[in-house]
Swiss-Prot record:
One of its GO terms (molecular function) is structural constituent of ribosome. This is Large ribosomal subunit protein bL17. The gene is rplQ. Keywords: Ribonucleoprotein, Ribosomal protein. Belongs to the bacterial ribosomal protein bL17 family. InterPro entries: Ribosomal_bL17, Ribosomal_bL17_CS, Ribosomal_bL17_sf. One of its GO terms (biological process) is translation.
Length: 145
């Protein structure tokens, strides 16, 4: 029986699953929008949201403490190391702490949005976009003819 068992297996070994979600998390942080299967998007949400909360905690510390104090530096480094321990991607950790901490400072959770987008052509797997809310919109250049 699977009573009280959390998470999905996706037909993969635990190491494969862990590597897959590390890569997907880094991609979501870097691009702020990715397309994947619906179950993977739902599972990814449970991984990315705590990482954004770490960035929010560092942003709050930045406002409360002097950025040159040893207490701030120690706590900031500890939070960044926690994020890097999972992501293993310096660019993603930098973007997470420098952009997302300030962007989501006033939001109390719910940093991601899942939008269903039909079914995959080959196997009819339900597909979805997962995006970070309040992301800057890139405007397409309109063709003037």
């Amino acid at each position: 029986m699977r009573h009280r068992k959390q998470g999905r297996k996706f037909g993969r070994t635990s190491s494969h699953r862990k590597a897959m979600f590390k890569n997907m998390s880094a991609s979501l942080i870097n691009h702020e929008l990715i397309k994947t299967t619906l179950p993977k998007a739902k599972e990814l949400r449970t991984i990315v949201e705590p990482l954004v909360t770490l960035a929010k905690r560092e942003h709050k510390l930045r406002q409360e403490l002097d950025t040159n104090s040893n207490e701030f530096k120690a706590q900031s480094v500890a939070l960044r190391r926690q994020a890097f321990d999972f992501l293993r991607n310096k660019a993603a950790v930098t973007k997470l702490f420098e952009e997302f901490g300030a962007r989501y400072a006033e939001r109390a959770g719910g940093y991601t949005r899942i939008l269903k987008c039909g079914y995959r052509f080959g196997d009819k797997a339900p597909m979805a976009f997962i995006e970070l809310v309040d992301r800057p919109q890139v405007e397409e250049a309109a063709d003037e003819e």
